[in-house]
Swiss-Prot record:
It catalyses: pseudouridine(1915) in 23S rRNA + S-adenosyl-L-methionine = N(3)-methylpseudouridine(1915) in 23S rRNA + S-adenosyl-L-homocysteine + H(+). It is found in: Cytoplasm. GO terms for cellular component: cytoplasm. Specifically methylates the pseudouridine at position 1915 (m3Psi1915) in 23S rRNA. This is Ribosomal RNA large subunit methyltransferase H. The keyword Aminoacyl-tRNA synthetase does not apply. It is an enzyme of class 2 (transferase). Its EC number is 2.1.1.177. Belongs to the RNA methyltransferase RlmH family. Keywords: Cytoplasm, Methyltransferase, rRNA processing, S-adenosyl-L-methionine, Transferase. S-adenosyl-L-methionine binds at residues 72, 103, 122-127. Homodimer. InterPro entries: Alpha/beta_knot_MTases, RlmH-like, tRNA_m1G_MTases_N.
């Protein structure tokens, strides 16, 4: 199983890249974790946001291919570390790749939300999208460590 984090936006600050890569490199070879960046549509005062969301959504779903789509969205379901670890095990047993979708400034397209098999809420707060990349990477690594009795996660 491969985990793909599919996110709208490129050219993130250095701290985002460093933070994400710190956890990305820790994943085992049998569970690769990769980042796919989708270019954000050009936004301006007269931008057609509905059209931009639709284009970003199509690109995200194309990148996901046949993978299991999981959206990161405020109205999604919050998971504890233990619940995420159980979810990770279920995904591994399913055998399909898992594609976690992070939208842009206006969130995810309706098509992405409709395609999602699950929706995960990190917080009821609106979080900066660059920060979400690092939080997701750390959370998934922590969940993996729990499933393998690795000492990273402590009760």
């Amino acid at each position: 199983m491969k985990i793909q984090l599919i996110a709208v936006g490129q050219k993130m600050p250095d701290w985002v890249k460093v933070g994400f890569e710190e956890y990305q490199r820790r994943f085992p070879k049998d569970m690769p974790f990769e980042l796919i960046e989708i270019p954000a549509g050009k936004r301006g005062k007269n931008a057609d946001i509905k059209r931009i969301l639709e284009q970003e959504g199509k690109a995200m779903l194309a990148a996901a291919g046949k993978g299991k789509v999981v959206t990161l969205d405020i109205p999604g379901k919050p998971w504890t570390t233990e619940q995420l670890a159980s979810q990770l095990e279920a995904w591994k047993n399913d055998g399909r790749d898992v594609c976690l979708l992070i939208g842009g400034p206006e969130g995810l397209s309706p098509e992405c939300k409709a395609a999602a098999e699950k929706s995960w809420s990190l917080s009821p707060l609106t979080l900066p999208h660059p920060m979400v990349r690092v939080i997701v990477a750390e959370s998934l690594y922590r969940a993996w460590s729990l499933t393998t009795n690795h000492p990273y996660h402590r009760e």
